[in-house]
């Protein structure tokens, strides 16, 4: 990955004076490949304020390179230059970890590797017993439907589409929220977001157009089991951070509460605050519930005539309690910055999920791993309980939503699964865990 970061301890030994590391992090077996990226001014303000209120800020590890890096596959990465066009954009510096940068260059020269771009898989094909996959059917760039035979099928199509492909292919029993039976589509979990924006005078230059996707400063004081939940009446937790990834001219427009939504006053406020504000977020954990699930839509279909995936979801009391608690704790950091104005963007009591505003793409569940085929779709190696030559890596395997973004653990779990495939399954195809 070329991850930039600062460890707190390595093999039980404190790294340096601990500055920049996360005191709540588990012990590491090795240092990060690269040192932490430089902090933006917004991150420096957050770090100073967090220290003042008694929290323990640390540099966010980021899959953006702080310097040149060559990974174990021989793939080369250049240093991130904080261009600000990171999230949602291809990196022209090769500074952002992704399969096309970190793995594909090593695969291309291999004689047994073929990449077929512009392909859309419609379903996994099963034999007459419905216990073995025979391949997949896909549509190519010319719109032709093609059947690709295969001895092994790996679904790595993002959380939503992994679940949809399993449902469309008849792999695993669909979840029924009324009876609680079935496994595919259950345990769908979101991410419980809260945001605070602090607005400053023109002499505080945060220059939000500068940024790197994963760079920032965070506190973990209220994440996971790092604090006593007892008095607060909820489970779960959240890191809080300033992650200045770059702010596009329109999407990044944000003005203090009370600013008119249009007209000359809005234009003036936009000019006054565009480069003089700090945005901080809590990316909170989210628990799965019986009534939050995924299934095939009975009405709406895609361009190929196949049912779309339907998401049935709403916030629950625990989610709102946790969210409001995080806003309160994060608000102390904002107040310590002494801004002109503060906007608190948290959930209200009784609030429902709103599909009109973007919140996060860090989704979990729907094809979860477990120890029992009656309650999970996959075993510990991400192998389907029902169709042994289908493996499904992705955040779809997580039964609950984490207090961190899932990407790092998705990658680790995928390597775990790939090793089991290579060292166990290919030598003796069949279930790797006996039900």
Where are these regions (language model features)?
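Conserved redox-cofactor binding core of oxidoreductases
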Residues: 1-118, 359
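A generic secondary-structure signal for well-formed alpha-helical elements
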Residues: 1-8, 50-57, 107, 111, ...
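Short, glycine/acidic-rich hinge or "gate" loops at secondary-structure transitions
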Residues: 5-26, 340-351, 427-435
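Short, solvent-exposed loop/turn and secondary-structure capping segments
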Residues: 6, 62, 68-72, 126, ...
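Conserved, non-catalytic sequence blocks in retroelement Pol enzymes and Pol-derived host proteins
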Residues: 36-38, 94, 317-322, 357, ...
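A glycine-rich dinucleotide-binding beta-alpha-beta segment and adjacent secondary-structure elements
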Residues: 82-86, 122-127, 275-286, 291, ...
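Glycine-rich loop(s) and the adjacent beta-strand/alpha-helix scaffold that form part
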Residues: 110, 119, 123-211, 394, ...
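FAD cofactor-binding and catalytic pocket of flavoenzymes
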Residues: 181-321, 360-364, 384-385, 392-399
């Amino acid at each position: 990955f070329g991850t930039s970061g600062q460890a707190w301890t390595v093999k039980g030994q404190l790294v340096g004076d601990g500055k920049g590391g996360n005191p709540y992090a588990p012990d590491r077996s090795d240092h990060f490949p690269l040192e932490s990226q430089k902090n933006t001014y917004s991150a420096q303000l957050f770090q100073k304020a967090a220290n003042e209120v008694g929290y323990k800020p640390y540099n966010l590890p980021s899959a953006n390179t702080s310097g040149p890096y060559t990974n174990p596959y021989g793939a080369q990465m250049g240093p991130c230059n904080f261009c600000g066009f990171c999230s949602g954009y291809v990196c022209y510096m090769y500074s952002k970890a992704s399969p096309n940068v970190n793995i594909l260059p090593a695969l291309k020269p291999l004689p047994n590797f073929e990449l077929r771009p512009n392909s859309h898989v419609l379903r996994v094909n099963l034999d007459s017993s419905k216990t073995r996959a025979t391949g997949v059917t896909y549509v190519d760039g010319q719109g032709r439907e093609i059947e690709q035979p295969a001895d092994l099928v790996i679904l790595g199509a993002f959380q939503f589409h992994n679940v949809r492909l399993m449902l469309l292919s008849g792999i695993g029993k669909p979840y029924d929220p009324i009876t609680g039976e079935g496994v595919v589509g259950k345990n769908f979990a979101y991410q419980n977001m809260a945001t605070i924006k602090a607005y400053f005078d023109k002499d505080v230059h945060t220059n939000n157009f500068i940024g790197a996707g994963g760079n920032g400063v965070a506190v973990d004081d209220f994440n996971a089991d790092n604090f006593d939940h007892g008095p607060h009446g909820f489970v779960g937790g959240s890191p809080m951070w300033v992650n200045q990834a770059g702010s596009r001219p329109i999407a990044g427009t944000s003005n203090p509460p009370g600013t008119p939504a249009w007209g000359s006053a809005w234009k003036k406020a936009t000019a006054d605050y565009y480069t003089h504000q700090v945005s901080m977020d809590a990316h909170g954990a989210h628990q799965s519930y019986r009534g939050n699930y995924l299934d095939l839509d009975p009405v709406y279909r895609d361009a190929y005539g196949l049912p779309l995936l339907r998401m049935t979801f709403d916030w629950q009391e625990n989610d709102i309690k946790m969210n409001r608690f995080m806003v309160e704790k994060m608000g102390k950091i904002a107040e310590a910055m002494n801004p002109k104005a503060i906007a608190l963007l948290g959930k209200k009591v009784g609030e429902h999920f709103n599909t009109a505003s973007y919140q996060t793409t860090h989704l979990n569940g729907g094809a979860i791993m477990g120890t029992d085929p009656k309650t999970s779709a996959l075993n510990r190696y991400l192998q389907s309980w029902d169709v042994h030559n289908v493996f499904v890596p992705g955040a779809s395997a997580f039964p609950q939503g984490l207090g961190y973004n899932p990407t790092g653990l998705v990658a680790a779990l995928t390597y775990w699964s790939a090793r089991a495939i290579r060292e166990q399954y290919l030598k003796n195809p069949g279930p790797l865990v006996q039900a």
